Amino acid sequence: MSDIQTSTVSEDGFACTSQVGDFDLQIDATDETGPNPNAALVATYASCFLPAFRVGGQKTGFDDLGKVQIDADADLDDSDDLERISFDVYVESDLSDDEFAEITELAEDICHVHDALRDELQADVTVVGDAF
């Protein structure tokens, strides 16, 4: 048996409902009833990277980073394919640039979505400390 199973249904049009475990996920290619697939992928990536960033903090001795927020940006090419992703990571803790770089490197190694993306789509990450 596989590790992940989903079922995706579209009754009409371009909106889909995916059953993921006990959760329904609404995705709509036209952005009418839910986010489009590209936006959902970027949000999923950020939602994976943020806890990986926290684990990276723990592994480097910073157990309490405080509030962490990722603002993600993405560009599309002329075919509406993802071309670039960037993360601005805002962290309550005030650490040095070197400490944030080490945490970011660990987060990139830990984040499963980061690993799943082709290299040119892996996010350019900027970290801002003492952000809140």
From Swiss-Prot:
Record Pfam families: OsmC (PF02566)
Keyword Transmembrane helix attached: no
The residues joined by the cross-link Glycyl lysine isopeptide (Lys-Gly) (interchain with G-Cter in SAMP2) are K59
Gene source species: Haloferax volcanii (strain ATCC 29605 / DSM 3757 / JCM 8879 / NBRC 14742 / NCIMB 2012 / VKM B-1768 / DS2)
Family membership = Belongs to the OsmC/Ohr family.
**Coiled-coil stretches noted in the UniProt entry, renumbered to this chain:** none
Q: Which UniProt keywords apply?
A: Isopeptide bond, Ubl conjugation
Q: Give the protein name, as stated in the record.
A: Uncharacterized protein HVO_1289
